[in-house]
Amino acid sequence: MNRRILCVDDEEAILKALRLHVRKVFEMSTANSGSEGLEVFEKKGPFSVVTAEMRMPGMDEATFLAKVKELDLCVSTVLLTVDADFEFGGATALQTGKMFSILTKPCPPVRFKKTIEDGIEAYHAAKTKA
């Protein structure tokens, strides 16, 4: 079973903290920008779950996650944000199925792991149907 995840965030400290919490459970790759994330996705994929910080320099998270979905329709995408409100369209993305989940930072490790587990299950269910 593919338990590979890609986490994209411009804050190295966030990526290190995520890796610390999931290293025994998931195989995690990281990137510091949307363009780097796409490169990692194409070269090291497939990934079951891709997480992205909402406000990244360069390519925004919506563009990045849309491009990831173009490459693999089954991948579960998770948005990480410090914004508790969803004025940026996050609720709509969830409702239309374009986004698997939205997590606010700081996110408790247990919640992050559970969301990733659920995303992996959704990925494999989608792959089975495809």
PLM region spans:
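Hydrophobic/aromatic residues positioned on beta-strands within the core alpha/beta folds
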Residues: 80-82
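Alpha4 helix (beta4-alpha4-beta5 surface) of REC/receiver domains from two-component response regulators
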Residues: 63, 84-102
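Receiver (REC) domain active-site loop signature in two-component systems and cognate sites
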Residues: 56
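C-terminal output helix
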Residues: 104-116, 120
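Two-component/phosphorelay signaling modules centered on CheY-like receiver
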Residues: 12-30, 97
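Conserved acidic segment of CheY-like receiver
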Residues: 2-13, 18-19, 50
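Active-site residues of response regulator receiver
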Residues: 53
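Helix N-cap/capping motif at the beta->alpha junctions
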Residues: 30-39, 61
